[in-house]
Amino acid sequence: MFKPQHMYDREFGTGNGYSNGNGYTNGNGHTNGNGNYNGNGHVNGNGKANGAKVVKMKPMDSELLREQGHIMVDFIADYYKNLQDSPQDFPVLSQVQPGYLRDMLPDSAPERPESLKELLDDVSKKIMPGITHWQSPSYFAYYASSTSVAGFLGEMLNAGLSVVGFTWLTSPAATELEIIVLDWLAKLLQLPDHFLSTGNGGGVIQGTGCEAVLVVVLAARDRILKKVGKTLLPQLVVYGSDQTHSSFRKACLIGGIHEENIRLLKTDSSTNYGMPPESLEEAISHDLAKGFIPFFICATVGTTSSAAVDPLVPLGNIAKKYGIWLHVDAAYAGNACICPEYRKFIDGIENADSFNMNAHKWLFANQTCSPLWVKDRYSLIDALKTNPEYLEFKVSKKDTVVNYKDWQISLSRRFRSLKLWMVLRLYGSENLRNFIRDHVNLAKHFEDYVAQDPSFEVVTTRYFSLVCFRLAPVDGDEDQCNERNRELLAAVNSTGKIFISHTALSGKFVLRFAVGAPLTEEKHVTEAWQIIQKHASKFTRNDHY
């Protein structure tokens, strides 16, 4: 069970300005006892409302926030400390069964307020067992949901201000900081000037990469339909590869593109699963001859499956030749491109119409934060703008003002640029580069382990911090090899000590080892390899079972 020691030290202490008795203040209009009401609207230890009248609580109280905020920070800090010091208490992959929580919680919400202590006890005893610990140093399954002190503090400040910056007027700082911070990040990535706010392009923070892909598909669709007419929507064709993220297909379907008009080009090991330019041009030529209208190409830098990289230079030349919108989805690997040694992977970006990355994946900005840059902001705005009367203000009509409601699907939007600003300032770009390099080096360390063991093989060329590997086939039997790797994956993950995932490449069942959790060190990689080797021992090359 999770035991947040510092939280309880503070909660049960006295004389520290925060707690009295069992952790809640008395005499200041807050709580007393165990967190339930007495007749004056405060708490009286027996869980019942005493007196004839219950005084309403205030939803926001600065002193209660100060008191309970300290308790919550202690709780979270203890969680991170325990992830490191007591990993046996935190199975990386949750071991519960579906529906486990239903029998542990009441059927209805409480009528009377409960104490924070009771709530956090329930988190420890009931919620934590159902958590897959993405922040565990032994989490290696999917691309990271990277967190940091700076990102966490930015989320706190965002929640505290709780602004809704859908137009410039509704919070000028929210809009202007986003513009500035995304220009900063674009310069770190050495993006072309047409992606900066000083021209016709600019950046916007979407919630996720999926949202980013959706809005640019809509922008590209409307741009081409203005030229050819709306009646030709059924003729529109898009292109990706069989490694392109599944959100691309979903975005196209939402945008009214017929499923049969989504061309996912086949990849293989000869290109390390990158999109082959010759296949793309052949598909475009074939579609044009059939009367279709090619309008969108989705290239990827760092695919979800294997971190493959599509060749942007030739793809960009093809897009330019045929006047097709080229989007570059670099949700994971785009973060690494702030490092000079990885910038080469987005060479050719100058021919792209849009580019997105997820700062919450590998730039330590916490969920969610997905910067998107477009070459022509007006194509995006024309596809997404709404102008209801209740949002009409004189200042909002000025061309110098950005109204981000017209750059996204939803109206409401969080002040996400705060945490990105704080991450960039509190760490500095050089530290961020080094964080990324450390993860890549740890992945290289794991890759070396795999390469040195003749029972295993590295399946794809490693570019970043993902290693694709597997138990090698015996006597060329791929079916048996796939089954062995399935069994190995299940055995390793059932330990709760580490969590890895899998993918399929050219019919091969492949194991994925993705480094990216902020607490991961070399010892965790070594321990993970030892666990994998231990469970693989029954699958030696000489074992034909």
UniProtKB/Swiss-Prot annotation:
Q: Which SUPFAM superfamilies match?
A: PLP-dependent transferases
Decide whether keyword Magnesium is in the record.
no
On this chain, the residues bearing N6-(pyridoxal phosphate)lysine are 361
State the superkingdom: Eukaryota
Task: Write the record's keywords in alphabetical order, separated by commas.
Answer: Cytoplasm, Decarboxylase, Lyase, Pyridoxal phosphate
Expressed in which tissues:
Expressed specifically in flowers.
EC number(s) of the enzyme? 4.1.1.25
Regions crossing the membrane: none
GO cellular component, alphabetical, reads: cytoplasm
Name the phenotypic consequences of knocking out this gene.
Slight reduction of pollen grain size.
Q: Under what conditions is it induced?
A: Induced by drougt stress, wounding and methyl jasmonate.
Q: Where in the cell is it found?
A: Cytoplasm
| Needed cofactors | pyridoxal 5'-phosphate
User: InterPro entries from the entry?
Assistant: Aromatic_deC, PyrdxlP-dep_de-COase, PyrdxlP-dep_Trfase, PyrdxlP-dep_Trfase_major, PyrdxlP-dep_Trfase_small
Q: Where is the sequence biased in composition, kind Gly residues?
A: 23-44
**Disordered: where is this region?**
23-45
**For L-tyrosine, which residues are the binding ones?**
245, 360, 390
Catalytic activity, reaction form: L-tyrosine + H(+) = tyramine + CO2
Biological process, per Gene Ontology:
amino acid metabolic process; carboxylic acid metabolic process
The record's family statement is: Belongs to the group II decarboxylase family.
Protein function: Converts tyrosine into tyramine, a precursor of isoquinoline alkaloids and various amides.
Quaternary data: Homotetramer.
Official protein name in the record: Tyrosine decarboxylase 2
Q: Mind giving the lineage of the organism this protein is from?
A: Eukaryota, Viridiplantae, Streptophyta, Embryophyta, Tracheophyta
